[in-house]
Amino acid sequence: MTQTLVNNAYGKEISMTVIGAGSYGTSLAISLSRNGANVVLWGHEPEHMAKLEADRANHEFLPGIEFPPSLIVESDLAKAVQASRDLLVVVPSHVFGIVLNSLKPYLRDDSRICWATKGLEPETGRLLKDVAFDVLGEHYSLAVLSGPTFAKELAAGMPTAISVASPDAQFVADLQEKIHCSKTFRVYANSDFTGMQLGGAVKNVIAIGAGMSDGIGFGANARTALITRGLAEMCRLGAALGAQPETFMGMAGLGDLVLTCTDNQSRNRRFGLALGQGKDVDTAQADIGQVVEGYRNTKEVWMLAQRMGVEMPIVDQIYQVLYQGKDARLAAQDLLARDKKSEGK
């Protein structure tokens, strides 16, 4: 019998290290370790991580859900990164590049990096894969995990489906094997590395619009129209970037869009609701109490659309509300007042 050589600080084989101990990172770590696999969860605040270890739970974000025995809580980045070949980065998009720079010195020669971050690079609107290549070079295999997932439901073991994409087919297969749980968590393989990243950013913006519409009181018809036309905008931008159209009909496109636009577990939707009810941007964000990815994503997607010459009227109106002080009701009226168009355009 061949014994696996273990060379890490924990003295046992680590299936995966999750970088980021917010609600989503913690829920993924719980799900990954639920079947007995050893998983390291790293967070950058030692006091927060000490509390997670003492409680063996994340009471702030995931109340009532205990950590499996095989989930290891860690605040030492070097130990966490070197513990496993495979890293899953789950941090807000505006610190994605910073976190990659922080972990880079500790990477192993065989490290592979996947991220579940949804968004684009701040101030540039670049895809996160381009940020990762800039920071890490082309030596390491990269992948993206995306789809319709709320952290509380995932952590509670409720049925969930998601997709993973990478230029490295073996990395995709290995991630499917590690993440997939036949009873509660289904993972689909996808070959569209670009489209998978874009869907997660654009849907955040459209969800703010859907929330604004509902906050104003426009009803189900308007919400559905926003979702449908928002999907069209997502597809147009994806086509300009070379993404595969079918990706946007899958988990990382339509699936995530519908989830985020229709359920109040979505911070982006709740943020939009508050704006539609008359609150200003700062108050609406403060009321959420956690990062609202769609706020920054709106500027990033708007910048990307401008650079690519892609018309995205919903994104444009939401950008004007968030960054130029436009009234949400006026933005909705201006959308309806646009020149007549064919549905396919």
Swiss-Prot record:
The UniProt record lists the EC number as 1.1.1.94
| Keyword terms of this UniProt record | Cytoplasm, Lipid biosynthesis, Lipid metabolism, NAD, NADP, Nucleotide-binding, Oxidoreductase, Phospholipid biosynthesis, Phospholipid metabolism
Annotated sn-glycerol 3-phosphate binding lies at: 118, 147, 149, 203, 256, 266-268
Q: Name one GO biological process term.
A: carbohydrate metabolic process
By its UniProt entry, which SUPFAM superfamilies does this protein fall under?
6-phosphogluconate dehydrogenase C-terminal domain-like, NAD(P)-binding Rossmann-fold domains
Pathway(s) where this gene product acts? Membrane lipid metabolism; glycerophospholipid metabolism
GO molecular function (one): NAD binding
One GO CC term, this protein: cytosol
Entries under InterPro entries matching the protein: 6-PGluconate_DH-like_C_sf (IPR008927), 6PGD_dom2 (IPR013328), G3P_DH_NAD-dep (IPR006168), G3P_DH_NAD-dep_C (IPR006109), G3P_DH_NAD-dep_N (IPR011128), NAD(P)-bd_dom_sf (IPR036291)
Name this protein carries in UniProt: Glycerol-3-phosphate dehydrogenase [NAD(P)+]
- Gene of this entry: gpsA
